[in-house]
Amino acid sequence: MEELQGYLEEDRSRQQQFLYPLLFQEYIYVFAYDHGLNSSIFYEPQNSLGYDNKFSSVLVKRLIIRMYQKNYLIYSVNDIYQNIFVGHNNYFYFNFFSQILSEGFAVIVEIPFSLQLISSLEEKEIPKSHNLQSSHSIFPFLEDKLLHLNYLSDILIPYPVHMEILVQILQSWIQDVLSLHLLQFLLHEYYNWNSLIIPKKSIYVFSKENKRLFWFLYNLYIYEYEFLLVFPCKQSSFLRLISSGVLLERIHFYVKIEHLGVYRIFCQKTLWIFKDPFIHYIRYQGKSILGSRGTHFLMKKWKYHLVNFWQYYFHFWSQPYRIDIKKLSNYSFYFLGYFSSVQINSSMVRNQMLENSFLMDTLTKKFDTIIPIIPLIRSLFKAQFCTVSGYPISKPIWTDLADCDIINRFGRICRKLTHYHSGSSKKQSLYRMKYILRLSCARTLARKHKSSARSFLQRLSSGLLEEFFTEEEQVIFLIFPKIISFYLYGSYRERIWYLDIIRINDLVNCLLVTT
């Protein structure tokens, strides 16, 4: 335990201690605005507040002063009960200012971790592999490893029910007392406001309205959990997991293995436990998968170990049903928009030896991935491309655009979705999705010009079809225009994994979340 504490202190020793003064620097909020706040509350003019969409450290100073004023919350609560309109207006004031402060605070606390990531890559001379950044890079790994496993644990990683637990984890990394005190005070005030206005859990509301800060604290919690989980493995080999360094990029992966060595001080039995290649751990978007070639009893031990680990180290109870143990041969698990399973195929082989012949039953395993059609249609329905049953409809909000822009938008969405789901072994779902988007595009154009969708399909038959092809299909269509139907029916049925998918389309992300 002392050795573990030493490693934790060594990793945390690089963190900067004085971050509080950065809260009052103008460029911090410029960075926060440029990072992607155009879709948040700051993008809309705040005429009701008396300010425009520009914000500065002056607003942050006002918020901090009002927060630390004596009996500020009591006066605010009395305003709510005296005048409900004034109360909601004060809530809007506080919500607006707290988002500014939380975004600025998120930028500040990310600075030392970003510096640690850069220095770690430079010291270890680890090259950045762009292929391993793709979310598709995990599927070839699954295809290679799952064929040898027996059981799979589908784990839904729990998160603390209160933000204070996440702040305590941050406290072990950053020694700036003023910044931590301000964050705790802000969360306390935020919880009190939302308990009066919105009858929901504070962590749920906070995660929706302060995404950047929440995801930073959540990723810090994930790193702490995984660091302690794989610590024995790190001590038995020179394989250093650097996923903690990639904390801020989340889905990015770097080359982790160059040379694999073993410390000789460990006995062979201990090394076999830690270096067993048939125990694999994978995590993505709050879910993780633990696969093993061992018995069901071994997987149950892992299950209760994780439950007790969350309870005693992070001080919150995780329900055991969040960890589902299944036999891999009878189970298909949902992961990254695919239903994945290991299929067992049986084939009879006749063997002839001299005058004797006999039959041999050969079993082969195959990793299979298919697209769930219902969640895919649900995501298209939420984007208003079709009805709940999958019937294509027009998109009225795009009728003000030019015809070429409408076609380009539909085609771009279709190509991206097809590009992401190209790893499916059954393409019927992709063909149906293309049909929905193509007909929705025609109905949108027909609604704009007050015509029928059939006329647009006849007029733009070939041109409209090309816009919905992927880049590979467009090349073959230009070279061999007469064999495109054969191409779609034949070789296009093969599974293809692309290693250039860094960001996920909104529709794909909706599909991942809603399933």
From Swiss-Prot:
GO terms for cellular component: chloroplast. Usually encoded in the trnK tRNA gene intron. Probably assists in splicing its own and other chloroplast group II introns. InterPro entries: Domain_X, Maturase_MatK, Maturase_MatK_N. The gene is matK. Its main location: plastid. This is Maturase K. It is found in: Plastid, Chloroplast. Transmembrane segments: none annotated. The keyword tRNA processing applies. PANTHER family: MATURASE K (PTHR34811:SF1). GO terms for molecular function: RNA binding. One of its GO terms (biological process) is mRNA processing. Keywords: Chloroplast, mRNA processing, Plastid, RNA-binding, tRNA processing. It comes from Zingiber officinale (Ginger). Belongs to the intron maturase 2 family. MatK subfamily.
